[in-house]
C-alpha cells in the first residue's frame, strides 16, 4: 500500500510539473502579458467610438469618449481556457459639436469574459486566440460649463476579438481584429429618456515586455472605427 501511494503521488507530481511546463511553453499569456495560473492586471484605456442616440424621435450622432482605469483578474481553469472579471472607474463624454456632455472620472464599471487559445506559440507558429466579453457602466453627464447633472448614461458593451501573438525573447508583439457593440440608455433631469447604439469592427496592435518572469508591461492601440490606446502593468502567479 505504501509503495502504491508513493507511486501515485509521484505520478501526480510528474503530471503537475509537465502540465505547468506545457502551459508555460504552449499557452503563453498573450494579452495579460504573463505566464501562470492567475494574472492580475491594472491598466488605463482611452477610447473614442461613434454612437447614435435617439432624441425626440431622431437619431443623433455623437462621439462617445471614455477613460477607464480597470483592475482585471484572469484565471486559467484548463489548458488554453481563460476566464476573467474586471472592475474599475470610468469617465464618459458625448461630443456633438458644442456644447459637449461630460462626466467625472467616478462612475463604476464592471464586467467579465472568456478567452480561448486555440493554437499555442510553438517554434515558428504564433499563438491564436479568441475572446468574448461584456462590460457595463453608468455615468452622470453634465453639459459643458454646466453645474448640474443633465442626464444619466447607461452603457453595455459586447466585445469580441481574434488575436495572434509571437514571443520574441522578452518582447511579445500581437495584433488582430475585434468587433464591438454598445447598447446605450439615457435619461435626463426632467424624465425624458431614450436609447442608442454603436459598434463596428476595428484592428488593433500591441506588445508586452516581460520585466521579470512574473511582471510585465504592455501597450495597445486600436484604430479604424474605434480609436483606443491602452497601457498597463501585469502580475502573474503560477498555480
Range-by-range predicted roles:
Residues 19-77:
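Short glycine/proline- and aromatic-enriched beta-strand/turn motifs that initiate or cap beta-hairpins
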Residues 58-128, 132-139:
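Glycine- and aromatic-enriched membrane insertion/assembly motifs of diderm outer-membrane
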Residues 36, 63-69, 104-112, 152-158, ...:
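Residues that define the transmembrane beta-barrel architecture of outer-membrane proteins
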Residues 44-50, 59, 87-93, 118, ...:
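Transmembrane beta-strands of outer-membrane beta-barrel pores
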Residues 38-42, 83-85, 126-132, 173-177, ...:
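Transmembrane beta-strands of outer-membrane beta-barrel proteins
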Residues 25-36, 75-80, 119-128, 167-171, ...:
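Short loop/turn motifs that connect adjacent beta-strands in outer-membrane beta-barrel proteins
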Residues 51-57, 93-102, 140-151, 184-194, ...:
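Outer-membrane beta-barrel translocator domains and adjoining extracellular loop/strand segments
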Residues 71-77, 85, 112-116, 134, ...:
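Residues on the lipid-exposed face of transmembrane beta-strands in outer-membrane beta-barrel proteins
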Amino acid at each position: 500500500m505504501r509503495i502504491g501511494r508513493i507511486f501515485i503521488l509521484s505520478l501526480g507530481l510528474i503530471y503537475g510539473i509537465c502540465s505547468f511546463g506545457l502551459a508555460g511553453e504552449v499557452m503563453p499569456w498573450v494579452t495579460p502579458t504573463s505566464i501562470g495560473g492567475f494574472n492580475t492586471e491594472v491598466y488605463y484605456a482611452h477610447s473614442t467610438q461613434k454612437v447614435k442616440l435617439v432624441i425626440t424621435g431622431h437619431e443623433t450622432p455623437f462621439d462617445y469618449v471614455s477613460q477607464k482605469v480597470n483592475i482585471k483578474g484572469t484565471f486559467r481553469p484548463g489548458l488554453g481556457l481563460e476566464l476573467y472579471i474586471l472592475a474599475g472607474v470610468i469617465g464618459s463624454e458625448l461630443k456633438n459639436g458644442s456644447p459637449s456632455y461630460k462626466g467625472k472620472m467616478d462612475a463604476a464599471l464592471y464586467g467579465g469574459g472568456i478567452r480561448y487559445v486555440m493554437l499555442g506559440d510553438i517554434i515558428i507558429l504564433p499563438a491564436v486566440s479568441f475572446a468574448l466579453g461584456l462590460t457595463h457602466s453608468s455615468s452622470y453627464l453634465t453639459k459643458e460649463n454646466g453645474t448640474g447633472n443633465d442626464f444619466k448614461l447607461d452603457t453595455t458593451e459586447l466585445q469580441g476579438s481574434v488575436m495572434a501573438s509571437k514571443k520574441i525573447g522578452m518582447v511579445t508583439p500581437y495584433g488582430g481584429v475585434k468587433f464591438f457593440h454598445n447598447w446605450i440608455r439615457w435619461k435626463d433631469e426632467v424624465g425624458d429618456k431614450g436609447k442608442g447604439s454603436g459598434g463596428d469592427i476595428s484592428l488593433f496592435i500591441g506588445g508586452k515586455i516581460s520585466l521579470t518572469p512574473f511582471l510585465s508591461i504592455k501597450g495597445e492601440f486600436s484604430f479604424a472605427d474605434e480609436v483606443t490606446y491602452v497601457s498597463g502593468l501585469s502580475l502573474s502567479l503560477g498555480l
